[in-house]
């Protein structure tokens, strides 16, 4: 028995209409279905779901580094940053990063879910860490 891939992502949201607009405008998500408290999208083949949950605390989530990262090309980095600014998306301060670790933009949706647009790959990260993070142990499978 093996895990095949990510099936879908679901985010709890407080305002369905505001969140639909966010995901359409920021991610280019294509709305597939909308109900009273749920919406499903296709994001370039990824199933994204939103469910309304109004009475849950949302004020401390920004202190966690937990996030979902999406790949963007290096050529599109500045354009994507400008788009987020134009859409008045909350852009977060990123961590200090070596250029070999590529570029990232961290931002949140209207409910504080944290995302990253990243120009690197897992292999870029591993290559960089192998050269610079000598305390790390690497495994071959």
Curated annotation (Swiss-Prot):
**EC category:** transferase
Any Gene Ontology CC annotation: cytoplasm
Where is the VOC domain positioned along the sequence?
Answer: 5-120
* Residue sites binding Mg(2+) per the record: 8, 67, 116
Keyword tags: Antibiotic resistance, Cytoplasm, Magnesium, Metal-binding, Transferase
| Protein's cellular compartments | Cytoplasm
Q: Where are the active-site residues found?
A: 116
Question: What does the record list as GO biological process?
Answer: response to antibiotic
The record describes the protein's role as: Metallothiol transferase which confers resistance to fosfomycin by catalyzing the addition of a thiol cofactor to fosfomycin. L-cysteine is probably the physiological thiol donor.
Cofactor(s) the record lists: Mg(2+)
Q: Which family does it belong to?
A: Belongs to the fosfomycin resistance protein family. FosB subfamily.
- GO terms for MF: magnesium ion binding; transferase activity, transferring alkyl or aryl (other than methyl) groups
Record-listed E.C. numbers: 2.5.1.-
Q: Which InterPro entries match?
A: Fosfomycin_Res_Enzymes (IPR051332), Glyas_Bleomycin-R_OHBP_Dase (IPR029068), Glyas_Fos-R_dOase_dom (IPR004360), Metallothiol_Trafse_FosB (IPR022858), VOC (IPR037523)
Report quaternary structure and partners.
Homodimer.
Is Transport set as a keyword in this record?
Answer: no
> What's the protein called, per UniProt?
Metallothiol transferase FosB
């Amino acid at each position: 028995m093996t895990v095949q891939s990510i099936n879908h992502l679901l985010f709890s949201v407080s305002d369905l209409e505001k969140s639909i607009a966010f995901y359409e405008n920021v991610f280019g998500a294509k709305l597939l279905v909308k109900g009273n408290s749920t919406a499903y999208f296709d994001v370039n083949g990824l199933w994204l779901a939103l469910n309304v949950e109004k009475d849950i605390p949302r004020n401390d989530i920004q202190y966690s580094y937990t996030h979902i990262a999406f790949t963007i090309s290096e050529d599109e980095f500045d354009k994507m940053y400008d788009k987020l600014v134009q859409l008045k998306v909350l852009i977060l301060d990123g961590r200090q990063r070596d250029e070999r670790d590529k570029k990232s933009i961290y931002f949140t949706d209207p409910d504080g879910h944290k995302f990253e647009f990243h120009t690197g790959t897992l292999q870029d990260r591993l290559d960089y860490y192998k050269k610079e993070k000598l305390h790390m142990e690497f495994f071959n499978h």
